[in-house]
Amino acid sequence: MPLSPLQSALSILPPDANEAIVSDHFVRSALLPALGFDSTEIVAHYPTGNRYIADFAARKNRENAEEKLFLQEPKNPSLLVEVKGKNWNIAQDTSKYREITEQLRNQLLGAKCQSTKWGIITNANHIQLFRKHGKVIFPATKCLELAVENVDEIVRKIRDKIEHPKRALTTTIYNNKGGIGKTTTTINLGAILAFLGKKVLVVDFDFNQRDLTNALGLTSHNGFIVNLLTQRATDLAAGIVTYSFRGKIKSFTFDVLPADQQMVSCDEVKLQQQAPGVHTFHEKLSPLKNQYDYIFIDVPPNWRWMTQLAMYAADVVLLPTKHNNFFSLHNVAVAIKDFLPQVQALKDEGTPVALPIFFNGEVMTDPQKEAAINEIECIIRDYQKKGFHLRPYFFPKWTDAKKDTHIHHIPNYAIIAHAHFKHVPAVYTNRTAFNYYLSFAMEYFLQ
């Protein structure tokens, strides 16, 4: 049987093919055409609007005859590709892998790439697809090893993902320490994004506390989640209710999946045996991911099966901490090193991945901030010795040239917590709270 164009391109590459050869003889001539782009839809050396240049940018031409071809007017690419030579080892978790993914991340966040949804890294030995949702960049596949035998199937799956993107970003809010403000974060982050016109679903998966459900003045389910996890016919959409707040000028709404009070007395071991697997909630949630822009899941402070269900359903994990809570900082490192990889190993996408931490609430003096930064530096050094690179999760703006220890801080503000008594998100009734969470959403989620 004759080789396909992808197989032929891969097979003729010399073992030490440099970046130029991989770019010309694999990416431009075979990979991008296999992904559905013709020569007028591909531009090399694309300036992304900051100081970074992508090796390739691509975008399907519009059907509007009056609009120029992407080659003629390269604007609003849908895909960027970063290429390296075969001597670059970009296998997962290598130093070169971290370097190339950071390059791609910087390119995707360029001013000329606000519409870009996809990024690819490849050296013709490996390939990985990344999804960009606003400012959030996360894996859409694992870093896959290429061979003549599998290249067609791998690229076919990548093309399918690119052509059928999920609308929603699914975020689980987690810390193994209680009292960190996960529920308050979930409510107000969802509410501020709804205010900005986004379609939002928040999920209360903390069945013992049910704080999110109660804070919004909603009624808990009585057996719905049990049925959802054990009965194939139960549709998640049937359990969703709409929270509405009527302002002076307009109303704001977002959807909620309330907690299930029956889960409190449920035998989790028996429930786990009855459910199809840890993928159960993910599969029930998946059809709704094209109906929402953002889905937020509030989970309990533990690593039991229900928390793992929510993690499996997530693209990313948001990790609130407190600067004066030693354990909340150390629990972040444990989650990134131990807990998240357990879930990533089970999924084809290699998700969820952690977003950078933030300090949630509490008044923070300069000496307290310095103490927290020093403790974080100790955590980073300790895990560095074990081969884990945690600095980007604690100090996302750190570079070799600029040792920036910035950590986003949502300050302590009594109105935010007091708003729960009124069953109204604080961002809908208080300007200061509104600005806190708007700043948070802009830094973490919106481009």
Spans of features found by a protein language model:
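C-terminal boundary of histidine-terminating zinc-finger modules
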Residues: I410-A441
